[in-house]
Amino acid sequence: MIKVMTVFGTRPEGIKMAPVIKALENDDTVTPVTVVTGQQQEMLQPILDIFDVKPDYDLAIMEPKQSLAKITSKVLLGMDDILTAEKPDVVLVHGDTSTTLATSMSAFFHHIPVGHVEAGLRTWDKYSPFPEEINRQMTDRIADMYFAPTLLSANNLIQEGVETDNVFVTGNTVIDALHYTLHKDYKNPVLDQIHPEQKMVLLTMHRRENQGAPMARVFRAIRDIVFENPEVEVVYPVHLSPAVQSVATEILGDIDRVHLVEPLDVVDFHNLAARSYLILTDSGGIQEEEPSLNVPVLVLRDTTERPEGVDAGTLRLVGTDYQTVKAAVEGLLHDETQYRDMADNTNPYGDGHTAERIVHLIKQFMM
């Protein structure tokens, strides 16, 4: 039996690692151990419930306004104790969070192989996104198995000197999760407030580098788009960060056709996205998920580590400039050809069977 420990701490990690955990649980040659760090405890728990993931350990590190250094050090120390007790054959981490980096370091100190799910993404700008770009680069220096979502991310790793035999193009597990969560008969109170003929725009924005002036610029653009285009309704699940909530409430809080709602669980979000006309986001995971829904995505960032979607035509980088965001949205609202050029493309990120591939590759690697 191979003991495989899966470690994650945030909502996006939970969504993307849940299919892997389920695939591990369904394999009778594997002993799975699941650890959550609690980096985003309040937002993570609903994901665990939806996918029926029952952690064996919870570090419960969540504290208000703690620094990145404190998060990283608490995970590093907490994982030291768990790895000493469990002695897994391999540790799986995901993506680019502080949990990812600290867990990889702790496993390295214990001479335990690390498998990096969603390896090889790069912007080549260490401060964009911050701190994620450096987290994933450092994790990829430590890892032993690299599960790259696309050929481009695999090539990034090989160009950095990673052995080709240790790099595997698997697709992205978020597509596996999307197949699990979409429901044809989905209902939500938010949808009851929006006339079917209205064009629903789904907005998400929360990244550290966008907080403050960039976020305010985007929100003002959204406000004016709604005022000038009566067919538009905006749904914005507002992140729990006080820095996000205060600006959202100040600029968007009193507009009838802007619906500021609590953060949505993954089922609600995926199904609202599937019914949207357009999505604006600074999220990484959404850039991968939503092209499967044939919904155009405007990315509220200046850089992306997911250029495959841009190259495929499903995503467009628009940054946070007021005029640029406003023009991009209104172009898609009023130009059917432009809209169809973005909507009618295939998703380059996977087929929904990534988790199965990863488990198979782990078993091969450990033999």
Question: What is the predicted function of each stretch?
Answer:
Residues V93-H94, H116, Y146, N271-V310:
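A donor-sugar binding/catalytic signature common to diverse glycosyltransferases
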Residues T29-K74, G78:
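Conserved nucleotide-sugar phosphate-binding/catalytic loop shared by glycosyltransferases and other
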Residues M1-G38:
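N-terminal subdomain of nucleotide-sugar transferases
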Residues T37, Q41-E42, I142-A213, V318, ...:
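A nucleotide-sugar donor-handling region in carbohydrate enzymes
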Residues H116-F130:
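A short, histidine- and acid-enriched strand-loop-helix "catalytic/donor-clamping" loop
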